């Protein structure tokens, strides 16, 4: 059963002081909390001098609280003309405030009106209070706050980052917390803390930190006398120039293009069709929602993270003037049976989500919400819905601006690496494009291009059906269950879709329309009146590519040849132990969840390339690692010399 996220609370003392049982008194005034945060944490870590003229700088703060440490770092960064190009702050918080309480808390401790716009931006971006990592961007993406909601020690052990400075506070000022931080520390990382107990000093010393007392705080450096870590924190990929090739211009590829361009990369986008979003990404709409299970398993956590990250990225696109069509009235996931509704209820009760994430509706409430008869209740996701995927791809492509070059109607026959550069070749052997980095986002063809023998992708044919305007009852929001129904802007109702593994026939079938009609009639009995002749209906056929474990393939690709040659030594390997193809990454195998996973996958790849903190926990990154099937084969002694 998942650990519920319990938010912090605020109270007002008789003397007017605002207090939080979790954080104590919140001091008012410029000489109070914010100034102390600057003195203790910012100055205590030698900032701003240490981040000057660097490309990126990463701070890990172990207790976000009301955001004083983050705001102090942000203000110092903006005031420094020699600041780093990109400032990352990773902040762990077991008991986050609600947006309203955070507003009260910050307003109470900050009286400097010059940062009121920063406070407003933080409040506007404040995420839904559910466990996991939440990435927020400010100052046009140059200041990045990654909030980690949940148990402090547990999350510190799961973070992937190379920290340059630690703001050490809260539960992390302990032996377990400091040991977790030591695994994140980059060379010459520094720390500052108010904690000065003997236990803290002992933990710092035994994990490689030097320390000294300065006024009311402890400061120091990570300077181990011997190597004590099996794995070093991630570094940026060394490249002579920030240039990349992305193959495939669907949801996965366009998301990668936008994220790389935002970091200053020049990208060549290669697409075999005449235009972007021509395959499954060209469907009139796709449904978009998280997954909820009683045990909050890997798929649930990954889907939740992808869902919330995509929402944040889409809002950023819209604010930048790159709008696209998407529904805004939520989505209802209807149970398929009484047993299915019981499972939904168990998952909802175990997770305990806030109402802005999900609400459980019984059959009567679901009926009232849709104004249609339904057999069962379900889960209402107020931020779920339907998205026009091609419009999203166009928006992401437009956001990349002059940093992207499109080669349409172009097929890549093979990849070849010469020195430190990848070459994309056509069937004559001519070079189409070259770059130090290639990202394969071309679904079923990715494994062939990369020569992956331990990845198996299965094609799944999906046929959707379009019902003309005026032939169905009004539907206020998309509904899914065993099938789905999505109202489009022009009054057309999209229903579907068939699920036909290993069927690669692109022709439309009347039988597929009949199957979709039958499925939706059971889902929403009052939606469709007189059944139309399936042979007269319009629709679309597209193909999704799925992996056996139904999780995507995102990240650096393994060097299978080298791994095979060293199979015996790699029999107990972790993902970090495997040899990788330098500069070759994948983002494919998304199945029917491209809308949910594409943005998060793109952010992960961009973060891996740049040596930035990852936007998801190590366990989840390992779960989508394209090398995971090779790892399983190595452990089972089914590879090369291990066999």
Curated annotation (Swiss-Prot):
PANTHER family recorded: SARCOSINE DEHYDROGENASE-RELATED, TRNA 5-METHYLAMINOMETHYL-2-THIOURIDINE BIOSYNTHESIS BIFUNCTIONAL PROTEIN MNMC
Organism: Burkholderia orbicola (strain AU 1054)
Gene field: mnmC
GO biological process: methylation; tRNA wobble base modification
Family statement drawn from the similarity comment of this UniProt entry: In the N-terminal section; belongs to the methyltransferase superfamily. tRNA (mnm(5)s(2)U34)-methyltransferase family. In the C-terminal section; belongs to the DAO family.
Record-level Gene Ontology MF annotations: flavin adenine dinucleotide binding; oxidoreductase activity, acting on the CH-NH group of donors; tRNA (5-methylaminomethyl-2-thiouridylate)(34)-methyltransferase activity
InterPro entries membership: FAD-dep_OxRdtase, FAD/NAD-bd_sf, MnmC-like_methylTransf, SAM-dependent_MTases_sf, tRNA_MAMT_biosynth_bifunc_MnmC, tRNA_S-uridine_synth_MnmC_C
UniProt keyword annotations, A-Z: Cytoplasm, FAD, Flavoprotein, Methyltransferase, Multifunctional enzyme, Oxidoreductase, S-adenosyl-L-methionine, Transferase, tRNA processing
Name of the protein this chain belongs to: tRNA 5-methylaminomethyl-2-thiouridine biosynthesis bifunctional protein MnmC
């Amino acid at each position: 059963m998942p650990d519920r996220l319990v938010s912090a609370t605020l109270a007002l003392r008789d003397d007017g002081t605002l207090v939080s049982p979790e954080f104590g008194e919140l001091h008012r005034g410029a000489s109070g909390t914010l100034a102390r945060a600057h003195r203790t944490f910012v100055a205590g870590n030698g900032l701003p001098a240490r981040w000057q003229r660097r490309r990126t700088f990463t701070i890990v703060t172990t207790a976000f609280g009301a955001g004083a440490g983050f705001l102090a770092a942000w203000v110092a960064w903006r005031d420094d003309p020699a600041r780093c190009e990109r400032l990352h702050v990773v902040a762990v918080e077991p008991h986050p405030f609600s947006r309203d309480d955070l507003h009260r808390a910050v307003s109470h401790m900050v009286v400097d009106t010059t940062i009121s716009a920063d406070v407003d931006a933080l409040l506007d971006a404040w995420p839904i209070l559910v466990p996991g990592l939440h990435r927020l961007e400010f100052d046009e993406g140059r200041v990045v706050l990654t909030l980690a909601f949940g148990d402090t020690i547990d999350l510190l052990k799961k973070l992937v980052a190379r920290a340059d400075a630690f703001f050490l506070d809260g539960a992390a000022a302990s032996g377990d917390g400091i040991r977790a931080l030591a695994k994140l520390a980059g060379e010459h990382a520094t720390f500052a803390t108010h904690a000065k107990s003997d236990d803290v000093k002992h933990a710092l010393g035994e994990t490689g930190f030097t320390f000294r007392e300065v006024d009311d705080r402890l400061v120091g450096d990570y300077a181990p006398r011997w190597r004590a870590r099996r794995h070093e924190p991630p570094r940026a990929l060394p490249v002579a120039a920030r240039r990349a090739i992305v193959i495939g211009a669907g949801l996965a590829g366009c998301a990668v293009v936008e994220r790389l361009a935002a970091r200053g990369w020049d990208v060549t986008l290669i697409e075999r069709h005449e235009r972007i979003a021509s395959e499954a990404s060209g469907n009139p709409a796709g449904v978009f929602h998280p997954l909820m299970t009683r045990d909050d398993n890997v798929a649930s956590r990954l889907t939740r993270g992808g869902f919330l990250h995509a929402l944040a990225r889409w809002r950023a696109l819209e604010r930048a003037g790159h709008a696209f069509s998407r529904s805004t009235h939520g989505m209802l996931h209807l149970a398929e049976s009484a047993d299915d509704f019981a499972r939904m209820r168990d998952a909802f009760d175990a997770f305990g989500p806030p109402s802005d994430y999900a609400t459980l509706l019984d059959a009567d409430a679901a009926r009232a919400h849709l104004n249609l008869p339904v057999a069962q209740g379900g889960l209402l996701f107020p931020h779920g819905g339907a998205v026009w995927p091609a419009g999203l791809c166009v928006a992401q492509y437009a956001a990349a601006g002059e940093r992207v070059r499109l080669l349409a109607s172009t097929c890549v026959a093979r990849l070849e690496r010469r020195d430190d550069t990848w070459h994309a070749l056509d069937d004559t052997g001519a070079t189409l494009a070259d770059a130090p980095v290639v990202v394969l986002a071309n679904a079923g063809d990715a494994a062939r291009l990369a020569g992956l023998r331990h990845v198996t992708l299965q094609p799944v044919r999906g046929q959707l059906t379009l019902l003309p305007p005026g032939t169905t009852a009004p539907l206020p929001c998309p509904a899914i269950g065993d099938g789905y129904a999505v109202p489009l802007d022009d009054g057309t109702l999209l229903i579907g879709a068939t699920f036909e593994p290993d069927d690669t026939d692109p022709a439309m079938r009347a039988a597929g329309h009949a199957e979709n009609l039958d499925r939706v009639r059971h889902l929403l009995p009052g939606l469709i009146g007189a059944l139309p002749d399936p042979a007269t209906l319009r629709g679309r056929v597209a193909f999704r590519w799925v992996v056996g474990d139904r999780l995507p393939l995102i990240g650096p690709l393994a060097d299978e040849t080298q791994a095979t040659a060293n199979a015996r030594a790699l029999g107990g390997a972790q993902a970090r132990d495997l040899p990788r193809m330098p500069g070759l990454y994948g983002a494919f195998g998304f199945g029917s969840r491209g809308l949910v996973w594409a943005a998060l996958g793109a952010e992960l790849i961009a973060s891996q390339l740049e040596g930035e903190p990852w936007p998801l926990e190590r366990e989840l990154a390992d779960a989508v690692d394209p090398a995971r099937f090779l790892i399983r084969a190595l452990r089972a002694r089914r590879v090369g010399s291990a066999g």
